[in-house]
């Protein structure tokens, strides 16, 4: 099966040569400058204008990482839910201005919920219900601007919890995202399923993948091949994925190596 063109997550200060390399081939670009706490409560119009100018020649897929610090999508307090929805709506306004096809949001599920499914059987359903309330207006807005919200695993150890949330909320603009590093951390520390199993569990709903490597100890955001993830197996799992998800390298340093890393992954897709 044909795979999506690989791209990268960037901030405005990314090296010009890397940005130009992405733009020259119209590779997907994911903007990550709008995630800091309280940022969406300030005047960010200049930053949006800078991005619009920087991206004016880019015709590839554009995405945005939405805000997540302190914004628990499973929060059951009504007043907090309103604030979280407001933050997501503000981020979606930015998506509209930058023509973003998707926005990444973080999953509220974790190992405590997984371990206590029988002890506290209402927790998962209550979390999904809260998600539905929080995302109701953002999903309406997303559908109006042609944007998809993609729910990324963060502390998840049971990939079926996110799947159940997507299925229960049942909105065409809500899909799944997988962060390979997060999945490998859960596998290494909590004996959660491996990255390839996270991918297979998302089949039919997977719209986006953050490709990053880790050592199994911390959320390193290293380039693929620099940690302990078995990349040929991950690529094999993505090859048979029917949904053709956006494939985004998400790293924190050594951005100048992104072209080589993309070439490496693309070589695996060709095997």
Where would I find each of the regions flagged by the language model?
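Active-site acidic/histidine proton-transfer and metal-coordination neighborhood
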Residues: 74-175
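Active-site beta-loop-alpha junctions enriched in small/polar residues
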Residues: 9-13, 32-36, 67-69, 108-110, ...
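Alpha-helix-loop-beta-strand connector modules within alpha/beta enzyme cores
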Residues: 51-69, 128-144, 231-237
């Amino acid at each position: 099966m044909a795979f999506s063109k690989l791209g990268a997550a960037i901030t405005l200060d990314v090296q010009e040569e890397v940005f130009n390399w992405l733009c020259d081939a119209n590779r997907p670009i994911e903007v990550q400058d709008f995630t800091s706490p309280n940022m969406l409560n300030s005047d960010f119009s200049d930053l949006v204008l800078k991005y619009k100018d920087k991206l004016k020649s880019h015709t590839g897929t554009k995405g945005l990482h939405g805000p997540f610090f302190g914004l628990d999508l499973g929060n059951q307090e009504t007043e907090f839910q309103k604030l979280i929805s407001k933050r997501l709506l503000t981020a979606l306004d930015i998506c509209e201005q930058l023509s973003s096809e998707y926005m990444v949001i973080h999953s509220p599920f974790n190992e405590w919920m997984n371990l206590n499914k029988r002890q506290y059987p209402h927790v998962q359903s209550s979390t999904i219900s809260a998600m539905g309330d929080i995302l109701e207006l953002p999903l309406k807005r997303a559908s109006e601007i042609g944007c998809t919200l993609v729910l990324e695993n963060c502390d998840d150890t049971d990939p079926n919890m996110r799947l159940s949330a997507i299925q229960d909320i049942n909105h065409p603009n809500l899909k799944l995202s997988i962060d390979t590093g997060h999945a490998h951390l859960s596998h290494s520390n909590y004996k959660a399923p491996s990255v390839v199993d996270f991918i297979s569990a998302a089949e039919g709903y997977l719209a986006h993948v953050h490709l990053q490597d880790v050592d199994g100890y911390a959320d390193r955001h290293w380039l693929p091949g620099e940690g302990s993830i078995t990349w040929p197996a991950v690529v094999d799992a993505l090859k048979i994925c029917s949904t053709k998800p956006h494939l985004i390298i998400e790293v924190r340093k050594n951005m100048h190596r992104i072209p080589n890393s993309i070439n490496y992954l693309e070589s695996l897709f060709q095997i």
